[in-house]
UniProtKB/Swiss-Prot annotation:
Residues 31-50 are annotated as: Disordered. NCBIfam families: PRK14094.1, PS_II_psbM. Pfam families: PsbM. It is a single-pass membrane protein. Coiled coil: none annotated. The gene is psbM. Belongs to the PsbM family. The chain crosses the membrane at residues 7-27. It comes from Prochlorococcus marinus (strain SARG / CCMP1375 / SS120). The lineage of its organism: Bacteria, Bacillati, Cyanobacteriota, Cyanophyceae, Synechococcales. InterPro entries: PSII_PsbM (IPR007826), PSII_PsbM_sf (IPR037269). This is Photosystem II reaction center protein M. GO terms for biological process: photosynthesis, light reaction.
């Protein structure tokens, strides 16, 4: 029972985290913030070492 529950949580996280990331990326794209995000990252604004 615990092993099945643990496996269910792992699979839920494995599917849920990328889904949340894609939804957030889609929302930012709909708001038109995706292009500004990539332009900022290419300038090294978000990553000081890059």
């Amino acid at each position: 029972m615990e092993t099945t529950n643990f496996g269910f949580i792992i699979s839920l996280l494995f599917v849920g985290i990328p889904t949340i990331f894609l939804v957030g990326l889609y929302i930012s794209t709909s708001d038109g913030e995706k292009s500004s995000f990539f332009s900022d990252s290419s300038k090294g604004k978000l990553g000081p070492k890059s």
